[in-house]
Amino acid sequence: MGLKHFLEKIEPHFLPGGKHEKWYALYEAAATIFYTSGAVTRKAAHVRDALDSKRMMILVWLALFPAMFYGMYNVGAQAFGALTPDLLQQNIANDWHYAFANALGINMSSEAGVSDKMLFGAIYFLPIYATVFVVGGFWEVLFATVRKHEINEGFFVTSILFALIVPPTLPLWQAALGISFGVVVAKEVFGGTGKNFMNPALAGRAFLFFAYPANLSGDAVWTAVDGYSGATALAQWAAHGADGLKNAVTGQTITWMDAFIGKLPGSIGEVSTLALLIGGAFIVFARIASWRIIAGVMIGMIAMSSLFNFIGSDTNAMFAMPWYWHLVVGGFAIGMLFMATDPVSASFTNVGKWWYGALIGVMCVLIRVVNPAYPEGMMLAILFANLFAPIFDYFVAQANIKRRKARSNG
């Protein structure tokens, strides 16, 4: 018996009147992973496309894999570089991640190979991702079952994005709390997928940032070594300018290429601009992400950073950060490529996408430079722009209406 025949055989049990009808959302989610839905339109308008929403979300999910794999490697690389023999023994005794890595025989030294660093990073990342996926998936299934809706695959993207934009040291219960806020409050309360006006992953991270700032900011959360502190590149620049960009372990200067590749501490998936550009190029080529939004973000960021460079400041080193450094530090790249381009919370109109993207770029630099307490600005910039996306679309639509009326009256 083939899989398709088996699914067709059990489908009546999940339809209205069947003994398992309340679990239809789960059946539909599993069945459409392997086969497209048999539903067809019965009246206009008919839209034909080779890519349905499920496949589109899975492609975005896969596009994040380069950043995910490099992020896991970097977690190990940063930790092993910071470890001393005393810190290693202390962490093995007090941290289950280290105890598990030690039981697996992982070489936790500065001489460790790529596989050891990758496996160590996976011990930190995978529990966070699994927690986010299970807890967020529970809320998705619950709301889909109550509303008798299908389970939307957008959660594949939300879950991995959330796991990639948090520090590797985030407690699992906070990961569960953050994704719960993002899914329930930022999405399901407004009607579910397609009706949320904010990016759920960013909303969840913002909730954690303001509720538990000690676990998402400061110098002690970015390197997975208890008892070690190491500032991010943004924090170093804000404190000491370009000359302050130093590797906390070796004392060597962090170059632009180091930052571009991702040889620095930070949230798991945001560190490597190179890996993010690989995935971003794929979703732009597949016409999933809007190139207009990405271009708008870059234009806004370059314009605002150039303005601050021109103004200058003797007391604020962030005024001197050039645009090409803004691009490779913090969460700018992952925000621009994978969050600003969220088709639900972004502007719909082509002109609106330019303004929406430009606002994100401007606000990101403005927050980074002017707010001394918060050197990272991409998260708040995107959430702020999400609120303005419908306004941009409204004015674009009104301008088109006025233009058509003027033509018809002329």
UniProtKB/Swiss-Prot annotation:
Its main location: membrane. Its EC number is 7.2.1.1. It catalyses: a ubiquinone + n Na(+)(in) + NADH + H(+) = a ubiquinol + n Na(+)(out) + NAD(+). The chain crosses the membrane at residues 56-76, 119-139, 159-179, 266-286, 293-313, 318-338, 347-367, 377-397. It is found in: Cell inner membrane. It is a multi-pass membrane protein. The keyword Ion transport applies. It is an enzyme of class 7 (translocase). The modification FMN phosphoryl threonine is found at residue 232. Composed of six subunits; NqrA, NqrB, NqrC, NqrD, NqrE and NqrF. Belongs to the NqrB/RnfD family. This is Na(+)-translocating NADH-quinone reductase subunit B.
